[in-house]
C-alpha cells in the first residue's frame, strides 16, 4: 500500500509535467509529508536527519539552477523531495544516472518531434514541449520515471 501510494504520487507529478509542464506544490508537499510520517514511524532519528539534510542541500543547489533559468521550479521541488526518499545511499548515484539517461532520451525525442510540421488538428492534442521549439523539456518526467524504476530499492519502501 505504501509503495503504491509513493508510485502513484510520483506518477501523478510526472504526468502533470508531461502534459502541462507544471508540477503542483500539493503533490510535492504530500510526498514530503508522506516521507516524514513514514520515517518517524520506522527510521532512526539520525537517518531522518541525514535524509532531510541531503534534500535541503539538493533544494539549495536546484534553487541556484532555477535562478539561472536552467531548470523549472517544479523540477527543483520534485527532485529535492525525491532525494529525501533516497537519502544518503548508493542508490542516489544510480538515480542521478537514470535521470540523466531518461532526460537525455526525452530531449532527443523533443528535438526530433519539433522538426516535424504537425497538422493543426494533431497539435491540439499534443503537449506544448513537443510542438513548440522554444518550450522547455519536462524533466519531471525523467525524475519521476527514474524514481519509479528504483522504487523497489528505496529502503523505506521495502517491506519489513
Residue ranges, per PLM feature:
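A membrane-topology feature that recognizes alpha-helical transmembrane segments
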Residues: 1-160
